[in-house]
């Protein structure tokens, strides 16, 4: 395997938004077995180092392709678009206002009579929006509307971050 291979090439899958998760998982397990550093323990230092680098690349590729957000960023980067998380924010005012409202709702969950129900309701709405954003990204990417896909990616980042915050709050509430 070439260390310079793109992530889709590593997993022998087509470059596309839609990834067959079972195929990705199966190929990952196969590559892990083939390039696990322990298999190279009796080899020379160069081979050991290459095995570690290859295993690291395989892990990075897998984590990127299995995550909708990371996969979207990677697809845009393959099109020479800087999709790093700090590179953009959305200019959609209505979307940004909704994000503020959702964060206020999140901050008030602890004060709710049933914080777990409030959190679940919030999660359901955010997951629905995130799913819609992923569908939008897929359509925009497939139609080569990369600027629009880039803007949708910014929205996906907001939603993914909010979902992480919801999970963190849920863990905090369970620990109380």
Question: Locations of the language-model features?
Answer:
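C-terminal accessory/regulatory regions appended to core domains
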Residues: 1-176
